[in-house]
C-alpha cells in the first residue's frame, strides 16, 4: 500500500451513511437489551467534493441499544469503521426505531434478539413467520403472543456522524521505505568498529528511582573464549484479560460475511 495513494479526505460531522446487512433484512430485539459488535456494511459510496471518501462495502461495527424508558425504542450506535487495516474509531447514531411486534416467548426460547427470514403460506392458506434464532430456523404458530420486540429494517438504515472522520491508514502494516545505500571506504583496522552503535532509547522511568539500581555492567566485555548459552523463561507471559460485562443483557455477534 502506497501512503501517497491513500485518500485522507475529511468526512465532516453530520454526514449521513446508509448501511445494510447481507443476510437479513429484518432484525428484532427485546427492550432493555443490547447487541454489541454487530457487523454492517456501507450500502452506497459516500462522496465528499466528488471524491469517494467511504466506498461501498466498507465494514462497520455498531451496538444495538434498546430501551423501554421513557419510550420503547432502539438505536444503532457505530463504534468502528474499517477503511484501512484494523479500522478506526467512529461515532455515529441512527434515528430511533419504535416499531413494535409481538411473539410467543416459548416458541423463540426467549431469545434477546432474532432475525426474520421470510413468511410462509401453508396449503391451508395460513401465513407463518419463519425466524432465525440461536442458530436455528423456526416456524411460528403466532399463538399466545406475549413478548414484545422492536423491529428494525436492516435492508437500509441510515446513521449520522457525530464527529469528523479523517481516514487513518494502519501504518504498522505499511512497508518501510529503504534509503539508498551509500558506499563507504573500507576500514584500515578491521578489529575496531567504524562507528559506535546507537544507544537504546528508554522512556521508562521506575516508580521509586531512589531505590532503583540497574542490574547490568556498563563496561562489560564478553569473553569469546568461553561457551555462552542463552536461557529463556516463559514466566513473564500471561494471558490477556478478557472483557466481561457481567450483564446478561449484553450480547455480541460476528457474521463472517463478505459484502
UniProtKB/Swiss-Prot annotation:
One of its GO terms (cellular component) is virion component. Keywords: Virion. Residues 179-201, 212-236 have a biased composition (Polar residues). Residues 202-211 have a biased composition (Basic residues). Residues 171-259 are annotated as: Disordered. It is found in: Virion. This is Uncharacterized protein L591. It comes from Acanthamoeba polyphaga mimivirus (APMV).
Amino acid at each position: 500500500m502506497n501512503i501517497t495513494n491513500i485518500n485522507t479526505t475529511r468526512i465532516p460531522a453530520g454526514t449521513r451513511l446508509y448501511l445494510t446487512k447481507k443476510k437479513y433484512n429484518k432484525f428484532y430485539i427485546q427492550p432493555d437489551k443490547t447487541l454489541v459488535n454487530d457487523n454492517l456494511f456501507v450500502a452506497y459510496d459516500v462522496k465528499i467534493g466528488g471524491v469517494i471518501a467511504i466506498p461501498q462495502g466498507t465494514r462497520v461495527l455498531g451496538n444495538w441499544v434498546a430501551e423501554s424508558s421513557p419510550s420503547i425504542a432502539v438505536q444503532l450506535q457505530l463504534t468502528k469503521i474499517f477503511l484501512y487495516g484494523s479500522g478506526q474509531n467512529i461515532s455515529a447514531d441512527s434515528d430511533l426505531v419504535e416499531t413494535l411486534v409481538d411473539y410467543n416467548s416459548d416458541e423463540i426460547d426467549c431469545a434477546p434478539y432474532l432475525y426474520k427470514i421470510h413468511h410462509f403460506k401453508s396449503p391451508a392458506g395460513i401465513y407463518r413467520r419463519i425466524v432465525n434464532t440461536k442458530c436455528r430456523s423456526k416456524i411460528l404458530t403466532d399463538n399466545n403472543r406475549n413478548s414484545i420486540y422492536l423491529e428494525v429494517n436492516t435492508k437500509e438504515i441510515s446513521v449520522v456522524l457525530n464527529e469528523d472522520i479523517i481516514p487513518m491508514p494502519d501504518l504498522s502494516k505499511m512497508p518501510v521505505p529503504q534509503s539508498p545505500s551509500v558506499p563507504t571506504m573500507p576500514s584500515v583496522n578491521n578489529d575496531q568498529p567504524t562507528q559506535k552503535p546507537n544507544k537504546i532509547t528508554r522512556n521508562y522511568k521506575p516508580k521509586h528511582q531512589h531505590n532503583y539500581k540497574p542490574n547490568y555492567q556498563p563496561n562489560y566485555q564478553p569473553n569469546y573464549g568461553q561457551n555462552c548459552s542463552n536461557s529463556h523463561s516463559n514466566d513473564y507471559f500471561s494471558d490477556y484479560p478478557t472483557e466481561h460485562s457481567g450483564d446478561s443483557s449484553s450480547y455480541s455477534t460476528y457474521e463472517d460475511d463478505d459484502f
